Regions:
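S-adenosyl-L-methionine
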Residues: 69-120
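Dinucleotide-binding Rossmann-like beta1-alpha1 core, especially the glycine-rich loop
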Residues: 259-318
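A conserved short coil-to-beta-strand element within the FAD-binding core of flavoproteins
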Residues: 340-355
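C-terminal catalytic lobe of FAD-dependent flavoproteins
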Residues: 317, 481-574
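Short beta-strand to alpha-helix junction loop
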Residues: 153-155, 271-280, 313-332, 458-463, ...
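Short hydrophobic core segments
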Residues: 220-221, 244, 365-377, 537
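Active-site substrate-recognition segment that forms the wall
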Residues: 200-219, 225-237, 246, 251-266, ...
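Core beta-strand elements of the Rossmann-like FAD/NAD(P) dinucleotide-binding domain
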Residues: 215, 360-369
Length: 574
């Protein structure tokens, strides 16, 4: 199936992507999504397709669900259109990462002004699909997203035939920017050709030293939600990943939370934490939909946020989830090997290969890339390097400032039927998940405490009472004291330690900024690991593989491990 106006053969597809690990398409006008659907289907039906298809598209306004109605498509393609329509719901201004075809097709939809959105990218496309640039500066902006050899298709339908002079100007602008057009027949509806400038391309487009051009062997230290999400993202890209953890099983730390909420943070100014958690929560829900069982491991229930100043906000795109189930699902990818009961005590680098060793000095293997995703453990491991590693003082400062914040979650089963309970989870100052299926019946969860002192955290009785007091303020019921009533049933407490950064945002990126040593960090998920982990993984692998970023370049800096530290010393949950 071809989209009206676009013949995939005019840009060499699908033949040119045969045998490639990945292929990146940049489309400056998403319109009704038909170009994307056409290319997605071509990828599905091609036995020589690349492992990953990245499609980056700009839409000036949020695409309308009705545009993608199933009735517009043949029966065997309706499922694709319906899946896309579902994923396009509730998309606002900004970047949106949408994973399709078992996460092997990545659609990055950028909603907003074309020039602004295009300026937030740093990748180079293999294929460019665009509207005719309005002037030479627009043509130059498109050129910045190309590499030598990029095939392009420029839609000239709006001006073709009506203004031959405009077509001539367009051809001149394109050629001056480095786009070499094929033969242009009279009344052509598009310009096609290759980006092949006569001059040397600026070195600013040269991939960073941190980029690894092809998949290899990677070791990840830590099998919690941070490490598992990175492992899965790398395995999808063909990496052979080994995940080490000192516990016998994955999710041995804070990721073993019995149930938690993936819900966006909100702020009056829609600050980076709010934007990143909104993107990350939506991305995590895509993984859950693909890998977990609804009603058992997770539920896209939505979450009602009670505001401290009064009123409430309904988060439609939010869920409750059992993190350990997702961690286990991520780690079941055939490209991942989990090794438990193994503490990584030292990392050495020689001849471009990292060697990991346990406390007894035993060799745990050699790897091109190592990702430290072991929360507070990363600080101690980084101090033990036996080779010179150039860590910037600012990153050293941020690692030294990591806080171990202890938290306790109360949970149990109902001793009696309770009227007036909410149907969906509620959060605010604390949270309450009213209905999660369990072996002993329907479970409830309330919490969690946020204790910087281990002595206070060790008094589980006091921690439970604090949870119940917070719950009574979150959900004041006239008929009965909710905390006291819940405590009549079978109640347990679950405790763990969170790794919290100075500004409550994770640290993601290469540990060394001056060389591509292959040592990366993904830590500091804090109290919002469910909202950040999947996004952090996408960001890390995008930077490692020179892929399109999952969020705006300017926003991604808020997660960069080497970002400038902003001072913050409070110990309150966000």
């Amino acid at each position: 199936m071809q989209t009206p106006g676009l013949d995939l053969a005019s840009v060499g597809l699908p033949e040119v992507w045969a045998g490639c690990d990945a292929w990146t398409v940049f489309d400056t006008d998403f319109l009704d999504g038909q170009r994307f659907l056409s290319l997605w289907r071509a990828w599905q039906h091609d036995s020589l397709r690349p492992r990953l298809l990245h499609y980056v598209a700009i839409a000036s306004v949020a695409p309308c669900m009705a545009t993608h109605g199933a009735g517009h498509h043949a029966d065997h393609h309706r499922g694709d259109a319906q899946e896309l329509a579902t994923q396009l719901l509730d998309r606002g201004i900004g970047f949106h990462r949408i994973l399709l075809s078992n996460a092997q097709v990545s659609l990055t939809l950028c909603i907003g002004d074309v020039q602004t959105m295009a300026g937030e990218h740093v990748f180079q496309a293999d294929t460019l699909l665009c509207s005719a640039p309005a002037n030479k500066w627009a043509a130059q902006a498109l050129a910045r997203r190309c590499k030598r050899g990029t095939r392009f298709w420029m839609d000239t339908a709006p001006i073709s035939g009506a203004d031959a002079v405009a077509i001539g100007h367009l051809s001149d602008w394109a050629q001056a920017a480095g786009f070499q057009s094929d033969h242009i027949p009279p009344h052509a509806q598009a310009l096609c050709g290759t980006f092949n400038p006569r001059w040397d391309i600026p070195t600013s487009r040269t991939p960073s030293a941190h980029v690894v051009p092809s998949p290899g062997r990677c070791a990840i230290v830590g099998a919690g939600i941070a490490g598992a999400s990175v492992a899965h993202a790398l395995a999808l890209r063909g990496w052979q990943v080994t995940v080490f953890d000192q516990e016998a099983h994955p999710s041995g730390g804070a990721s073993g939370l019995p149930a938690g909420l993936a819900v966006p943070h909100t702020s009056a100014d829609d600050n980076p934490r709010s934007r990143l958690s909104r993107s990350g929560s939506r991305l995590l829900m895509q993984h859950a939909e693909r890998l977990l069982v609804r009603g058992q491991d997770w539920e896209p229930s939505g979450v009602l946020e009670k505001r401290a100043e009064g009123g409430a906000l309904w988060h439609r795109q939010a869920c409750w989830i059992t993190p350990a189930a997702l961690v286990q699902a991520w780690l079941t990818h055939p490209g991942i090997t989990f090794i438990g009961n193994t503490k990584v005590a030292a990392i050495q680098r020689a001849d471009g290969v990292w060697t990991l060793r346990d406390p007894q000095g035993r060799d745990l293997g050699g790897y091109a890339v190592v990702v430290l995703a072991n929360a507070m453990g990363c600080a101690k491991l980084l101090k033990g390097f036996e080779v010179g590693v150039q860590i910037q003082p600012d990153l050293q400062d941020k690692i030294a400032a990591l806080q171990a914040i202890h938290g306790t979650l109360s949970h149990g089963t109902y001793a009696e039927a309770l009227a007036g309970l909410p149907e969906t989870p509620v959060n605010g100052n604390g949270c309450f998940i009213p209905r999660v299926p369990g072996a002993a019946g329907t479970q409830w969860f309330a919490g969690s405490t946020f204790e910087p002192e281990i002595r206070a955290a060790s008094d589980l009785g006091a921690q439970h009472m604090a949870n119940m007091e917070r719950l009574n303020h979150l959900l004041p019921l006239e008929a009965f004291d909710l905390g006291e009533t819940l405590s009549r049933g079978q109640v347990s407490q679950w405790s763990a330690t969170r790794c919290v950064t100075h500004d409550r945002l994770p640290l993601v990126g290469p540990i060394e900024t001056t060389s591509g040593s292959g040592l990366w960090l993904c830590a500091g998920m804090g109290a919002r690991g469910l909202s950040f982990s999947a996004l952090c993984a996408e960001l890390l692998v995008a930077r490692l593989g020179a892929e399109p970023l999952p969020v705006e370049f300017s926003l991604s800096g808020s997660l960069d491990a080497n970002r400038v530290r902003r001072k913050r010393v409070d110990t309150q949950p966000d």
